[in-house]
């Protein structure tokens, strides 16, 4: 007798401890992202990026690959849960996330004496904003006037980069 098409098929996916760790950390980052999404922003487009604390923490506690997975899973899952997947909001989040990850991939190799969590948080925040503003300028608002937003967003990146960096440094100090 031949097997029916509708017979049960078992698919087994083997997961590792690293997979479970990434899933837990991504879930934490997604939760922070969702909480942040319900808090009203004083300026449109300006958010503190508290989920990035998790990414930076993971970068220091584990490695770049784990941090990249956590960041990208947060961007994709957060956009699905908030209904933004493939929208301009998603594209902006992804461009900012990729920009900051690219910068962190380089910055993590710099001397830790001068490039600690606060410095990397500030640099990543600036890279995030730069990536987003480039997409805005090239795609959403192809006008030179977008440059007038740079001081506002740069100030926000500096302030929130410092705050998130201090929180990350505190978390790292508490866990060592």
PLM regions: where:
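Short helix-perturbing small/polar motifs within transmembrane alpha-helices
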Residues: 10-14, 22-25, 31, 70, ...
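Membrane-embedded alpha-helical hairpins and interfacial helices in multi-pass inner-membrane proteins
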Residues: 85-91, 110-176
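Hydrophobic alpha-helical transmembrane segments
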Residues: 19-24, 53, 57, 68-72, ...
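Hydrophobic transmembrane alpha-helices
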Residues: 3-57
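Generic transmembrane alpha-helix motif of multi-pass integral membrane proteins
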Residues: 50-66, 103-107
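Interfacial aromatic-anchored transmembrane helix boundaries in multi-pass membrane proteins
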Residues: 33-48, 73-102, 149
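Helix-loop interface residues and adjacent transmembrane-helix termini in multi-pass membrane transporters
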Residues: 38, 61, 111-114
